[in-house]
């Protein structure tokens, strides 16, 4: 594979803690590239430490875009991301620079390379009404309502899946159409697969899991707990994406005195390991065009680059 050819964008995906950021930084420094975040949690300003965003000194070395530009109170979606990414990509191309998209959120990569379903934004008042109904009546009642209004969606969703049940009802309430109808309509992709070089960094599993555990402890020592304490003090909706970032719910429980610090760390590590496992499975089945390689092979590929 040649990473620098034909004005193609570079996509670097992989599980959390796989060394993607360091690889992207080395590539960007060598090629004069712009690094564009493709991680759904690193967009949040409030969670620099706990989401392992690039360090400020690394961000100063090359341009980094779409990091920390969203407040935790925002229900930031793949649709928001694609709109922001389109603007950044246009700017990068006008500058004549190489765009390097890096992250672990498969849905974002799929939206970039396959297009996005055309679901219109749900008005805030409808979203709030559904959330209030969820809190008042419980998830089983909402699932029963969904079964009456969109039987196919209700059959697909777990009866305890609060987030997806609420989302399906919001879309029906706002548009009068089931979510599946909207998913059948997609927008043209920003980055068709033939216009990209796409890598998936695949470390050895046990080494990755050990690195995840060690990194979680490092993040706690580096200020993640204080970060979560500030976030919890805002009293935000626990269903917001930022409030469900790996480690946030467990650390909030610790701050409330419900569990010990050790228990919170154990939960946070386990949640992150399970997420990494799902990332392997998701990319293998959903985006088979990504070329899988070990971190060592990817580093060798970058270091062998000859930049004109």
From Swiss-Prot:
InterPro entries given in the database record: Dimethylallyltransferase (IPR039657), IPT (IPR018022), P-loop_NTPase (IPR027417)
EC code: 2.5.1.75
Binding site for substrate: 16-21
SUPFAM superfamilies registered for this protein in UniProt: P-loop containing nucleoside triphosphate hydrolases
Enzyme type, top EC level: transferase
Cited PANTHER family: TRNA DIMETHYLALLYLTRANSFERASE
Subunit structure: Monomer.
Protein name, per record: tRNA dimethylallyltransferase
Species for this entry: Bradyrhizobium sp. (strain ORS 278)
């Amino acid at each position: 594979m040649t990473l620098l050819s034909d004005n193609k964008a570079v996509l670097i995906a992989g599980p959390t803690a796989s060394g993607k950021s360091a690889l992207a930084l080395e590539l960007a420094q060598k090629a004069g590239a712009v690094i564009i975040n493709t991680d759904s949690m690193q967009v949040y300003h409030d969670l620099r430490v706990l989401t392992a965003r690039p360090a400020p000194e690394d961000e100063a070395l090359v341009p980094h875009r779409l990091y920390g530009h969203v407040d935790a109170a925002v229900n930031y979606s793949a649709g928001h991301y694609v709109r922001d990414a389109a603007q950044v990509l246009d700017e990068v191309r006008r500058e004549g620079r190489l765009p390097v998209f890096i992250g672990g959120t498969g849905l974002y990569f799929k939206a970039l390379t396959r297009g996005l379903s055309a679901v219109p934004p749900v008005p805030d008042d409808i979203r709030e009404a559904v959330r209030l109904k969820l809190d008042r009546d419980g998830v089983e009642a909402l699932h029963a309502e969904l079964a009456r209004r969109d039987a196919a969606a209700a059959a697909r969703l777990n009866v305890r899946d609060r987030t997806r049940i609420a989302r399906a009802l919001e879309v029906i309430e706002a548009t009068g159409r089931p979510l599946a109808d909207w998913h059948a309509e997609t927008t043209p992709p920003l980055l068709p697969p033939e216009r990209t070089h796409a890598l998936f960094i695949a470390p050895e599993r046990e080494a990755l899991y050990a690195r995840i555990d060690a990194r979680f402890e490092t993040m706690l020592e580096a200020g993640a707990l204080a970060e979560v304490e500030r976030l919890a003090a805002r009293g935000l909706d626990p269903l917001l994406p930022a409030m469900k970032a790996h480690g946030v719910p467990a650390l909030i429980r610790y701050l409330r005195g419900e569990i010990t610090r050790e228990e919170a760390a154990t939960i946070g590590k386990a949640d992150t390991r399970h997420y990494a496992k799902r990332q392997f499975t998701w990319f293998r089945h959903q985006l088979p065009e990504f070329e899988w390689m070990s971190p060592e092979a990817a580093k060798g590929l970058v270091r062998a680059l000859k930049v004109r």
